[in-house]
Amino acid sequence: MFGNCQKQNCCTQRNNTGICYSVCPPQTVITVPGNVTCNASRIYVNIGRPNNCFGNDGDLYLDTNTNNLYYKRDGVWLLVGNLSGSSGPSGPQGPKGEKGSNGDKGDKGEIGIQGLKGESGADADKGDKGDKGDKGSKGTKGENGDKGNKGDKGDPGIKGSKGEKGSKGDKGSKGDKGDPGIKGESGADADKGDKGDKGSKGDKGDKGIDGNKGEKGSKGDKGDKGDIGLKGESGADADKGDKGDKGSKGDKGDKGDIGPKGESGADADKGDKGDKGSKGDKGDKGTKGESGLIGTKGDKGDKGDKGIKGDKGEAGTSILEGSGVPSPDLGNNGDLYIDGMTGLLYAKINDEWVPVTSIKGDKGDKGDTGLKGESGADADKGEKGDPGNKGDKGNKGDKGSKGDKGDKGDKGDTGLKGESGADADKGDKGGKGEKGDNGEKGSKGEKGEKGEKGDNGEKGDKGDNGEKGEKGEKGEKGDNGEKGEKGDVGIKGESGADADKGDKGEKGDKGVNGDKGDKGSKGDTGIKGEAGTAANKGDKGSKGDKGDKGSKGDIGISIKGDKGDKGDKGSKGDKGDIGIKGESGLSIKGDKGDKGGKGDKGDLGSKGDIGLKGDKGDKGDVGLKGDKGDKGDVGSKGDKGDKGSKGDKGSKGDTGSKGDKGDKGSKGDKGDKGDKGSKGDKGDIGSIGPKGEKGEAGSTNSLYIGSAQLGNAGDFNNEIIPVTGIAYITAVGAGGSGYSGTTGGYGGGGAGGAFINYPVYVSSSQTYSAHVGFGGAQVAGNSNKGENTTITIGNLVLLAGGGEGGTATTGGTGGLVSINGTQITAGAPGGTSGNSGVSSIYINPLVIGGAGGGGGSNGTNAGNGGNYAGFTGGIASPGVNGGGGGGASLFSNGFNGETGAPTTDSGTNYGAGGGGGGNGTQGGNGSLGYVRIDFYSAP
């Protein structure tokens, strides 16, 4: 019934939102009962308070920024109420998506041909060392293969070099549960090394002078996390060979591909030990590979290996962080802002910060407990070292100031445990290794545990008596150290096999601090080969140069795509190379994924406009009791008939309706007294109305929870709300009484104002209170107003006003309707002398002003009460002194003149006005108010 919005209804000047609309805002259609006559109205939905320059009287406007509802009356938009409430429940789960087809399996690269295994030869002399092969040329880049099926989880990547310190990231979501750690193997027997020679006794040092008091040290930098040690391979039994000649320094070769796993070689004669090779040249920095073509988006697979670091992207949008709502002066359009207090993400649009979503995620699952390692093998206790010479006692230094506590360094990863070596002959003693580079200064360590008591040293020679020193000053009491964090519990290793105790080696000289070299890139982890044949221990090779550090890539912006359906498990693909460690991305947490197997949860739809509640549908199957039919109109008066001839005396007929006073007839003959007529037949029952159409079967997932009906006048306090959802409130004020008097005809009472299925969002943590109004009581020489009916939920107060009592000449005014003290509509006026009351006033189908009572007699007749929809006002009593009828309410016809509600209401006449007094009869009572609240879990 609503036409399209015309352009002339749009504003010709800027409204409070700063935008002049040339098209109509979204509209919502509301169905109005067919028996209600009203002008075509429109409902506007927009942001901000409406401007009076658009819209017509009777239109509605919803401000989506505040959920305030406005009604236009007399050219002005009036605030009706606020439709805000608690958030609705989650929507139903969307259907499970179709299963994606398996992707094509990528072609596996060919494995190089394995050399034939040689037969065990007879003892032969060791041949000369072959020349180093030329460096192969770089192969051309292969085309992108088809998308392969998901491969098995790759081996743990080697730790990359420490990246530059990034800016503090946002708190990320808890990661996926890690896989259990690999269980280490047990160590095997090792040969006992030769006992080192006893070092000569050092000369007695001179007495040092007292040092100056040192300045307070600056806080040390946090140490880098240690790399994971490579896993050593096991050696096999072999005879010890002679030491070979020292080879010339070879060029540094390119990094070779990982070869296939070779078979175990047969035992062979021991070769001579080669000389220590010279230090290789530093290799050139490898060229950066080309980017692959972008493939089509496939089904989402399981979590893959860490990808290669991408090229540097262009500068993106700024992401700001703070506590609380961002200031309008902060940032530029397009920037994002994260409120650290609430987890809300804001975007700046048109110079305003608009909340977008919350990035706070759910807590992840607890990871599985790692496997317990096997026990380590027992090792023999080393021999006791020779006691050292007793040094001179130094002077007591000044107490240094307490340094700041350094940051606790990251715990290094546990190195892989090497496999056990098979029994082998003891190798020659290795030469003294070069001194390693000094590591960066670590943070101050926590106080170590008390060591075990050492063995008693041999008694030294008696020293000369020293001079008596001066008594030192008492030192200040040191500050209590902060309690250190509890360290992680290490994995228990297996017990090692018994091994011979090694001799104590000589103490090497202290080397000169070398310059710290650049950290080299970490190579791929090679495939573990089988145990080789026994070989002599070679000399320790020189340390290679440290590779250049790769350039740091830009931080990528995380744009989360839609979650794909879980694909079938693909066949096992080839193991990929370990990717370069990427920089830390900004932590913008996505939505928590659904449990596997279950379909994705549908996106939460944007909040729709709150529609006005339509008419209540018929109950499924069993039909609701139909509304009471309208009272038929009084038939029109017929013309006066001609005087008929005297007929035969008939049986006494039914009493006819009172006719008009006829002309005086001629006196007839006196007739015989007639027999008493038989009782007339009972009138036929009215025809049954047409059967209503069968309603649709009610849903088994009904949102309806229950209803509360308050049909007795009085107070109802702190009543329980059974659900968090929406409540539809129907309420009516009490009716006013008719004016009482016996000397003339007086006005009828007005009906109460009403709410019909008015929607209010509620929470089960709330309660509601209500007052159901008492009907206006008759009183001689006057009338009484019906009481108001009120409902209070939180800070919302709905008031359905009681109807006014009639006066000596006019009918009572109907009850008004207000929300939080603001009048939404007034009641309809009562009729003046001899005139009917005005029918109910509609603001919309949810709010109704009460109908007015009929006016008192004007010397000829009184007026009827005003109507409401299907209910009619009370009929005025006849005669020059007849009383006016009462106004009709939401639930009942008005009471006729000179009648009213009984002292104990029958429960069906809620809110109706009492009839006016007349013809010697007092005026009638008004009927009491009523409240009904229907609770639903969702609109």
Curated annotation (Swiss-Prot):
Residues glycosylated per entry: 15, 35, 39, 82, 788, 820, 858, 919, 925
One GO cellular component term noted in the UniProt record for this chain: virion component
Pfam families named among the record's database cross-references: Collagen
Low complexity bias (residue ranges): 84-95
InterPro entries linked to this entry: Collagen (IPR008160), Collagen_Structural_Proteins (IPR050938)
Residue ranges, annotated region (Disordered): 84-332, 358-697, 896-923
Compartments in which it is found: Virion
Keywords: Collagen, Glycoprotein, Hydroxylation, Repeat, Virion
Processing and modification events after translation: May be hydroxylated on lysine by the viral-encoded procollagen-lysine,2-oxoglutarate 5-dioxygenase.
Domain of life from the UniProt record: Viruses
This protein's name: Collagen-like protein 3
Species this chain originates from: Acanthamoeba polyphaga mimivirus
Organism taxonomic ancestry: Viruses, Varidnaviria, Bamfordvirae, Nucleocytoviricota, Megaviricetes
